[in-house]
Amino acid sequence: MPTIEGGCLCGAVRYRSDAEPLMQVVCHCETCRKNSGSAFSMNVAVPQDSLRIESGTPRRYEDHSGASGQAFYRFFCGDCGSHIYSHGAAYGAIAFIKAGTLDDPNWLAPNLHIWCAEKLPWVDIPEGATQAPANPS
C-alpha cells in the first residue's frame, strides 16, 4: 500500500499516513451524515499515531452526540470547512480519515457498512458487503 496523502479543499491542511489501512468503513449514522453533509460517511481507518499533519492546523470540534456519549473529536480546516479526520476514546488509537479528502481515492474498496439501522432507505449497499446495525462488537 502506498502512502496515504490528502488534504482539504483549499489546500491549507495536508496530511499523510504510511500505515496500512486498518479498514475502510462506510458509516450511516445520523451524526456522520450531518458531519459529512451527505447520505453517509466514507472513512479510511489508520493507527492514530501514523497520521501526520504535514501543513496547516486543523480546528477541532468535540462531539458528544454519538451512542456512547463519549467525546469524539472531529478535525476540519478552519478556512474552507473540509472535514479531514476524526477519533475518539471509544475507538481506541484509530483515526478515521474522510475518504473524500484523499488525493487518490481510486484504490478504495469499502466492504464494511456500520449503523445500517440508520441508513437512508434510498441508499443501496453492494451485495456481499458486511453490514452491522450499529457499531460492530
Residue ranges and their predicted role:
Residues 1-137:
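A short Gly-Trp-Pro
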